[in-house]
C-alpha cells in the first residue's frame, strides 16, 4: 500500500460495506472494535523488482497486518444465522482495482454467485490469479493486458461462499482477498479496527471474525437494538 493513503482506502471500504441493511422492525446494529493482542510489528517496505516506472512511483508496504491504536484493519466480521437483510450495491457489484501495482481494496466482500469486476488502472500487464483460501491451487488465472481496463470474472468462480486469495504472477508482491458470502450481515473493520453492521434483527447469533494473518475467531452475541461487540485476535 502506498504510504499516506492507507487510512483513506480503509475508510472508503468500511463505508461501502457498512451501508444500512433492511431488517425486521426490531432490527438494530452490531458495532465495536477488533483489537490486536500483543505488539504489532512495523510494516515492511516491499521490494519492487518489475515495471518500476509504474510500480515504483510510491513505496509499497506489506499491509497483511495493519494495526492503529490497538485496532486491526481488514478483518471481516460476519453474523451467522440472521434472517432477512439486503445486500448493498457494493456487495452485488464488487470491484477491485490494480492501481500502483497493488490490489485496492486489499480485502473486499461480495455476494456469493455474482461477478467480480477487476480494473487495471496501471495500463500494464497484470494477471488475476485466484486461489481457494491460502491454498496454492488455482481457481482462475486470467491475463489482463494493458489495453483491457475492465475484466469481468464469471460468477461461477464465486458461486460458493468462501475466501479467495488474489495474486498476480507478473508482480509477486501483489495480494488481495475476496470473501464471497450468502449473508448481507457482514462488515470489514476500518481504520483503528472499527466496524458496524446495521439492520440486524434481535436474536442470538454466532459472530465469525476472519483476518488473513490472524486467522478465524468465533463468538456469541445477543442482539437487542444497538449492540456493542469488541473482540481481540492475534498475539
Residue ranges and their predicted role:
Residues 17-19, 62-63:
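A short, compositionally biased domain-edge/stem linker segment
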Residues 26-235:
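Extracytoplasmic copper-binding redox domains, predominantly the cupredoxin/blue-copper superfamily
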Residues 19-27:
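Sec/Tat signal peptide C-region and signal peptidase I cleavage site
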Residues 2-14:
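Bacterial N-terminal signal peptides that target proteins for export
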Amino acid at each position: 500500500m502506498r504510504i499516506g493513503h492507507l487510512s483513506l482506502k480503509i475508510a472508503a471500504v468500511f463505508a461501502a460495506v457498512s451501508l444500512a441493511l433492511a431488517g425486521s422492525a426490531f432490527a438494530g446494529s452490531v458495532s465495536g472494535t477488533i483489537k490486536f493482542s500483543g505488539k504489532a510489528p512495523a510494516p515492511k517496505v516491499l521490494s519492487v523488482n518489475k515495471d518500476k516506472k509504474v510500480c515504483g512511483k510510491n513505496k509499497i508496504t506489506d499491509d497483511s497486518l495493519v494495526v492503529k491504536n490497538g485496532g486491526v484493519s481488514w478483518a471481516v466480521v460476519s453474523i451467522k444465522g440472521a434472517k432477512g437483510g439486503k445486500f448493498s450495491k457494493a456487495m452485488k457489484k464488487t470491484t477491485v482495482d490494480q492501481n500502483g501495482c497493488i490490489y485496492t481494496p486489499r480485502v473486499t466482500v461480495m455476494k456469493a454467485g455474482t461477478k467480480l469486476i477487476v480494473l487495471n488502472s496501471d495500463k500494464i500487464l497484470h494477471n488475476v490469479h485466484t486461489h481457494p483460501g491460502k491454498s496454492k491451487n488455482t481457481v482462475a488465472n486470467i491475463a489482463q493486458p494493458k489495453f483491457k481496463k475492465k475484466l469481468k470474472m464469471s460468477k461461477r468462480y464465486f458461486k460458493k461462499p468462501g475466501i479467495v486469495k488474489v495474486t498476480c504472477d507478473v508482480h509477486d508482491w501483489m495480494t488481495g482477498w475476496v470473501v464471497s458470502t450468502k449473508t448481507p450481515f457482514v462488515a470489514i473493520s476500518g481504520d483503528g479496527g472499527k466496524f458496524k453492521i446495521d439492520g440486524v434483527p434481535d436474536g442470538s447469533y454466532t459472530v465469525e471474525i476472519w483476518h488473513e494473518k490472524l486467522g478465524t475467531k468465533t463468538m456469541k452475541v445477543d442482539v437487542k437494538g444497538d449492540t456493542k461487540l469488541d473482540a481481540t485476535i492475534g498475539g
